[in-house]
Swiss-Prot record:
Keyword Disulfide bond in record: yes
Keywords from the UniProt entry: Cleavage on pair of basic residues, Cytokine, Disulfide bond, Glycoprotein, Growth factor, Heparin-binding, Secreted, Signal
Subunit structure comment from the entry: Homodimer; disulfide-linked. Interacts with WFIKKN2, leading to inhibit its activity. Interacts with FSTL3.
Chief location of this protein within or outside the cell: secreted
UniProt organism field: Sus scrofa (Pig)
Protein name: Growth/differentiation factor 8
Length: 375
């Protein structure tokens, strides 16, 4: 009996000594595993973020059909950027893409950008001739995105220099044509009379939709136009070739084209922040800064929220994806499993210079991740 008590005491002593040591080791091991898991998750998200930024660069150039980023300096942009109402309204009222998570729909849109507004600056043409010793203005080349049956608006914008006294100005827009037998080289497009008050100059818009549509249907008829804005003394107030201090006052065309919406369907996903410990597939914030890229050719936005997807897609959570689950059950070794990918993406509006120094305001599809899921 005494020996039995001794064995019991020894056994209890071993439990007391050994027990806490084992528990501490297990706790430390568990903590180390958790820390290692968090570090791996952070590194994985950082790599995913970097890959997403590089992919965005490639996508933007591809969707705008640009082989390389346009090489336009800040000084050139300052000279080319019109100081005109339509462009200022676009910049002032520009709606940088909001992170709107209230709608759970998945956007189905085209891969290439759908243009809404194109601002075309005048360019030189070998066809233009001098009339009465004055260089002609202006000739416009049009993007292939502009099709005559999709044009909803076309405005010619011209700037009139300021006057010192109240003046009546006669504005005339002439279309250059092939010389006729009687020597006529142009035909009238629009004429209007304006009353100008002393002070600053003014921008005047003129509807040229019909002329533009004719040019698009018959490109060979596009020989250019001549702009005149004569005051009562015969002085031309129209800025056609800007002089000193007249940067941004060139004439230009503002063209609006149609856009066709697409259908959508429902979907849902998780939202996380950079400090989240969530291991499942989740959407994380990511801001794209075009100035950091050195992309001065993008006028607006200078930055936008793009977001990215990261996380695990465990088969145990796949009641929502029965097809993927059945494939895995049928061939567990041959299936790579679902990936955490965007399930809802939305477009951004962008104002930019293209490779031909034209200013384009367009919608670029699938540039913002709104939802993430396993698929």
């Amino acid at each position: 009996m005494q020996k039995l008590q001794i064995y019991v005491y020894i056994y209890l002593f071993m439990l007391i000594v050994a027990g806490p040591v084992d528990l501490n080791e297990n706790s430390e091991q568990k903590e180390n595993v958790e820390k290692e898991g968090l570090c791996n998750a952070c590194m994985w998200r950082q790599n995913t973020k970097s890959s997403r930024l590089e992919a965005i660069k490639i996508q933007i150039l591809s969707k705008l059909r640009l082989e390389t980023a346009p090489n336009i300096s800040k000084d050139a942009i300052r000279q080319l950027l019109p100081k005109a109402p339509p462009l200022r309204e676009l910049i002032d009222q520009y709606d940088v893409q909001r992170d709107d998570s209230s709608d759970g729909s998945l956007e189905d849109d085209d891969y290439h950008a759908t243009t809404e507004t194109i601002i075309t600056m005048p360019t030189e043409s070998d066809l233009l001739m001098q009339v009465e010793g004055k260089p002609k203005c202006c000739f416009f080349k049009f993007s292939s995105k502009i099709q005559y049956n999709k044009v909803v608006k076309a405005q010619l914008w011209i700037y009139l220099r300021p006057v010192k006294t109240p003046t009546t100005v006669f504005v005339q827009i002439l279309r250059l044509i092939k010389p006729m037998k009687d020597g006529t080289r142009y035909t009238g497009i629009r004429s209007l009379k304006l009353d100008m008050n002393p002070g600053t100059g003014i921008w005047q818009s003129i509807d040229v939709k019909t002329v533009l549509q004719n040019w698009l249907k018959q490109p060979e008829s596009n020989l250019g136009i001549e702009i005149k804005a004569l005051d009562e003394n015969g002085h031309d107030l129209a800025v056609t070739f800007p002089g000193p201090g007249e940067d941004g006052l060139n004439p230009f065309l503002e063209v609006k084209v149609t856009d066709t919406p697409k259908r959508s369907r429902r979907d849902f996903g998780l939202d996380c922040d950079e400090h989240s410990t969530e291991s499942r597939c989740c959407r994380y914030p990511l801001t794209v800064d075009f100035e950091a890229f050195g992309w001065d050719w993008i006028i607006a936005p200078k930055r936008y929220k793009a977001n990215y997807c990261s996380g695990e897609c465990e088969f145990v959570f796949l009641q929502k994806y029965p097809h993927t689950h059945l494939v895995h059950q049928a061939n567990p070794r041959g299936s790579a499993g679902p990936c955490c990918t965007p399930t809802k993406m939305s477009p951004i509006n962008m104002l930019y210079f293209n490779g031909k120094e034209q200013i384009i305001y367009g919608k670029i599809p699938a540039m913002v991740v709104d939802r993430c899921g396993c698929s």
